[in-house]
């Protein structure tokens, strides 16, 4: 098939014949190739101006053609038919030029050391380059691969092999390091997640416990208030029903209403004492946990939450301004006295100082919260007791003055 392709190749452009024209000497060339030769010669005989001489590129014989030029030469219809049929068929064993459609690579460019087609030589980037036919170029380059291979010595091969092994070892070592880091990441975040999950459960458990304390504090009071309200509703219903009774029935039951009302009036309503939860989890998370290092989270203790009566300002009955001023001053004196006593205890108690100095930062924070809570509750109770005592003392003094 390759030899057959050579028969269909123009000897001038080394491409498949395009519009093949046959000369009187029986040699065939492309029409464009003959026109290029004719234009390049430019020789016209003066004595025979109506004939144009053309020298055959193969046999060098001169042919006189009509003034119409190459168009006057006959077309090689047989060759053109063969070419058309050849181009319609697929030839997978024939390598064609990637730049020129369906043009076979049948010439070897000596300058660029690559196969080219006829169009590459005439109109392409290889125009004017030295060329050689395939067979001749093959014979010249046949021993080239072996000669090039001989340039690679045994030492080079050994070095290359050792380098490959070294690269494989480094790659394996790096992959082991990466795998170890992956396992470390998984283990670290698993432990961190377990710690956070445990802390979360501890917080939720503590909140549930303080929620139970809230229920124990308020639910009985609410039930008692509901009971009193039900009694009052029953009394209101009884009062409405009496309006429809006869005078006799009315007088019999009105005393019952009077007694029930008297009982309800004498039954004191409990004072609503608000409570507060201490410490607040939201404040702990915002102020302490947000500043805690990740590695120290497992060492942070969950505080025990409690409820205590909400601290209220001490109120004084009476409308006399002098009395109020006196009691305010007395209140300041009492608070100052209590503060001095507590500061003295903290200053002179060596055991407390030793305890605070030996405790760690985390334990100190937790202990401080507990101490502050206990101290606050104690101060509040002492203050309320003193207020009550001074209130009774004031009542006693005013009664004596009144008499």
Curated annotation (Swiss-Prot):
Gene3D superfamilies for this protein: Classic Zinc Finger, Zinc/RING finger domain, C3HC4 (zinc finger)
Cellular compartment(s): Endoplasmic reticulum membrane
Any one cellular-component term (Gene Ontology): endoplasmic reticulum membrane
UniProt xrefs under PROSITE patterns: ZF_BBOX, ZF_RING_1, ZF_RING_2
E.C. designation(s): 2.3.2.27
One GO BP annotation of this record: negative regulation of canonical NF-kappaB signal transduction
Major location category of this protein: endoplasmic reticulum
Record-annotated membrane-spanning stretches: 329-349
Record carries keyword Zinc-finger: yes
CDD domains, A to Z: Bbox2_TRIM59_C-XI, RING-HC_TRIM59_C-V
Reactions catalysed according to its record: S-ubiquitinyl-[E2 ubiquitin-conjugating enzyme]-L-cysteine + [acceptor protein]-L-lysine = [E2 ubiquitin-conjugating enzyme]-L-cysteine + N(6)-ubiquitinyl-[acceptor protein]-L-lysine
Membrane topology: Single-pass membrane protein
Zinc finger boundaries on the chain: B box-type: 92-134
UniProt subunit comment: Interacts with ECSIT.
Full protein name: Tripartite motif-containing protein 59
Species this protein is from: Homo sapiens (Human)
Lineage: Eukaryota, Metazoa, Chordata, Craniata, Vertebrata
Chain's gene name: TRIM59
């Amino acid at each position: 098939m390759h030899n057959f392709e050579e028969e269909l190749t123009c000897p001038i452009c080394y491409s498949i014949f395009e519009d093949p024209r046959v000369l009187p000497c029986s040699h065939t060339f492309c029409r464009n190739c003959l026109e290029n030769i004719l234009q390049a010669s430019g020789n016209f005989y003066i004595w025979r101006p109506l004939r144009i001489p053309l020298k055959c590129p193969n046999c060098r014989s001169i042919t006189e053609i009509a003034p119409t030029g190459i168009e006057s030469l006959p077309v090689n219809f047989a060759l053109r038919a063969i070419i058309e049929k050849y181009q319609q068929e697929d030839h997978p064993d024939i390598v064609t030029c990637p730049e020129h459609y369906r043009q076979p690579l049948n010439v070897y460019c000596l300058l660029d050391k690559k196969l080219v087609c006829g169009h590459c030589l005439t109109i392409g980037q290889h125009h004017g380059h030295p060329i050689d036919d395939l067979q001749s170029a093959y014979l010249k380059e046949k021993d080239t691969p072996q000669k090039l291979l001989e340039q690679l010595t045994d030492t080079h091969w050994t070095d290359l092999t050792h380098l490959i092994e070294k690269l494989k070892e480094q790659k394996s070592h790096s992959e082991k390091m990466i795998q170890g880091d992956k396992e470390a990441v998984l283990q670290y975040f698993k432990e961190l997640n377990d710690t956070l999950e445990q802390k979360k459960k501890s917080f939720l458990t503590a909140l549930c416990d303080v929620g139970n304390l809230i229920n124990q504090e308020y639910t009985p009071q609410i039930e008692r208030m509901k009971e009193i309200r039900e009694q009052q509703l029953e009394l209101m219903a009884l009062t409405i029903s009496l309006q429809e009774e006869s005078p006799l029935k009315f007088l019999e039951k009105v005393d019952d209403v009077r007694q029930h009302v008297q009982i309800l009036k004498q039954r004191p309503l409990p004072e609503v004492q608000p409570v507060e939860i201490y410490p607040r989890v939201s404040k702990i998370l915002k102020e302490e946990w947000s500043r805690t290092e990740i590695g120290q989270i497992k060492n942070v203790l969950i505080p025990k939450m409690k409820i205590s009566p909400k601290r209220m300002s001490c109120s004084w009955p009476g409308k006399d301004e002098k009395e109020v001023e006196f009691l305010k001053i007395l209140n300041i004196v009492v608070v100052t006295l209590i503060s001095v006593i507590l500061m003295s205890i903290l200053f002179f108690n060596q055991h407390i100082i030793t305890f605070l100095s030996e405790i760690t930062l985390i334990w100190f924070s937790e202990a401080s919260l507990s101490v502050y809570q206990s101290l606050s509750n104690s101060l509040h109770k002492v203050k309320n007791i003193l207020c009550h005592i001074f209130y009774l003392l004031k009542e006693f003094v005013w009664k004596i003055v009144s008499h």
